[in-house]
């Protein structure tokens, strides 16, 4: 689960991190009032969306008057912001953050952390190349990113934070300030179950002070039950509507850009199904794992989710009956087809527990459902059916 910038800054400030002050505004009038309250020579108005690249997309503007702040807020609020990290539809802007005057600054640094599955540790990253896309730095000049692995038994050690400060070229009181900031970041990361944390840029101001100009936090969704106060900050408007609906039924759904809907039990089988659809010349419209213990109700909801995507021109159902029985899946498919009034081709491949009985139930249903023998056969049939419709 992602947090907005204003939420991330509020959380980080509780751990002693110096953050750029800002006031949330949900209307042009509130933006103008925020500008007056900040009282600087200018302010920065930032669109609050769950996506990077806001500046280049016109979502971050410098304003020099209350009228200008109101005008920028008016042009942003209620629109969708399209960045390199969003799809073509973009993300809805429901509010803006009016931030204090921070510039000019001496330098812009980068501070981030992720859970690294390779080392099975939290890994912090620092770089002198702040204020730019860190992905580009990692690709073009990876040597400019310094990584610090944190031993989970002892946590972040002060010497590690000092080493990072020296690597960034900091000196004197700046080293102590950065060390405090980095140790606070680690504490926030662990106590709140972050999956990803980023401050870009981390500004070194002309007075020698450090300030978090931006803040990005992604929370581990599997740990949200431990943080109801953070879960309450979830902004579903920033998420794919179908993915939100899927989470309510414990379905793993990811929307893609193809036209062949996929319903599979098991993540590995789901990925293999998408691969073979591509191999046969088709384009999967989604990743959807109904889980090993799929129930009739979840299969019906999965069908509804797939067909809610207007780009879907056919559906491939690929079920391996291990825990789940194929005859139960067959009954659920029939119920879903009748309830949703399916008009697109549906190809079903059933293997495993009661597969023959499941196939018999489908064949005797009187519905336009195509049975397949094996994954290759299933992929070929759905790709051919979709091309015939197109």
Swiss-Prot record:
Substrate binds at residues 265, 322-324. Keywords: ATP-binding, Ligase, Magnesium, Metal-binding, Nucleotide-binding, Tricarboxylic acid cycle. ATP binds at residues 46, 53-55, 100, 103, 108. The keyword Metal-binding applies. It is an enzyme of class 6 (ligase). Its EC number is 6.2.1.5. Gene3D superfamilies: ATP-grasp fold, A domain (3.30.1490.20), ATP-grasp fold, B domain (3.30.470.20), Succinyl-CoA synthetase domains (3.40.50.261). InterPro entries: ATP-grasp, ATP-grasp_succ-CoA_synth-type, ATP_grasp_subdomain_1, Succ-CoA_synthase_bsu_CS, SUCC_ACL_C, Succ_CoA_ligase-like_bsu, Succinyl-CoA_synth-like. Binds 1 Mg(2+) ion per subunit. It catalyses: succinate + ATP + CoA = succinyl-CoA + ADP + phosphate; GTP + succinate + CoA = succinyl-CoA + GDP + phosphate. Belongs to the succinate/malate CoA ligase beta subunit family. Succinyl-CoA synthetase functions in the citric acid cycle (TCA), coupling the hydrolysis of succinyl-CoA to the synthesis of either ATP or GTP and thus represents the only step of substrate-level phosphorylation in the TCA. The beta subunit provides nucleotide specificity of the enzyme and binds the substrate succinate, while the binding sites for coenzyme A and phosphate are found in the alpha subunit. This is Succinate--CoA ligase [ADP-forming] subunit beta. It comes from Chromobacterium violaceum (strain ATCC 12472 / DSM 30191 / JCM 1249 / CCUG 213 / NBRC 12614 / NCIMB 9131 / NCTC 9757 / MK). The lineage of its organism: Bacteria, Pseudomonadati, Pseudomonadota, Betaproteobacteria, Neisseriales.
